[in-house]
């Protein structure tokens, strides 16, 4: 069975965000913290201000696709990452959003 490595619990989100280690740009905010699990985990947060449930789920699906592309490229590293979508993401195309997320991941890895 495939392990999705997704953060789902609210207390895990709060723990990562409370450490105040983040990078941001116009479309996304990425909070991160080192974990001791030995593998990468991620969580996605989309606020209600970005639209109705259909729109928010579409955004989450797009971010998951962007992350899947990143996982193939990146080596294994043990971090927990929370990706928060911002309003600007709605105005950009999928390709522009993917470039923005790639820039943040590169900045995060440095």
From Swiss-Prot:
It catalyses: Endonucleolytic cleavage of RNA, removing 5'-extranucleotides from tRNA precursor. It comes from the Bacteria. This is Ribonuclease P protein component. GO terms for biological process: tRNA 5'-leader removal. RNaseP catalyzes the removal of the 5'-leader sequence from pre-tRNA to produce the mature 5'-terminus. It can also cleave other RNA substrates such as 4.5S RNA. The protein component plays an auxiliary but essential role in vivo by binding to the 5'-leader sequence and broadening the substrate specificity of the ribozyme. Gene3D superfamilies: 3.30.230.10. Consists of a catalytic RNA component (M1 or rnpB) and a protein subunit. InterPro entries: Ribosomal_Su5_D2-typ_SF, Ribsml_uS5_D2-typ_fold_subgr, RNase_P, RNase_P_CS. Its EC number is 3.1.26.5. GO terms for molecular function: 3'-tRNA processing endoribonuclease activity; ribonuclease P activity; tRNA binding. Keywords: Endonuclease, Hydrolase, Nuclease, RNA-binding, tRNA processing.
């Amino acid at each position: 069975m495939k392990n999705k490595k997704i953060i789902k619990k609210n207390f895990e989100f709060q723990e990562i965000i409370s450490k105040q280690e983040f990078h941001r740009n116009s479309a996304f905010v990425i909070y991160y913290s080192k974990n001791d699990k030995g593998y990468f985990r991620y969580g996605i947060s989309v606020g209600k201000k970005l639209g109705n449930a259909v729109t928010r789920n579409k955004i989450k699906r797009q971010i998951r696709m962007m992350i899947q592309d990143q996982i193939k490229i990146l080596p294994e590293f043990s971090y927990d990452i929370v990706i928060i979508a911002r309003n600007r993401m709605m105005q950009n195309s999928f390709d522009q959003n993917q470039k923005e997320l790639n820039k943040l991941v590169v900045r995060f890895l440095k």
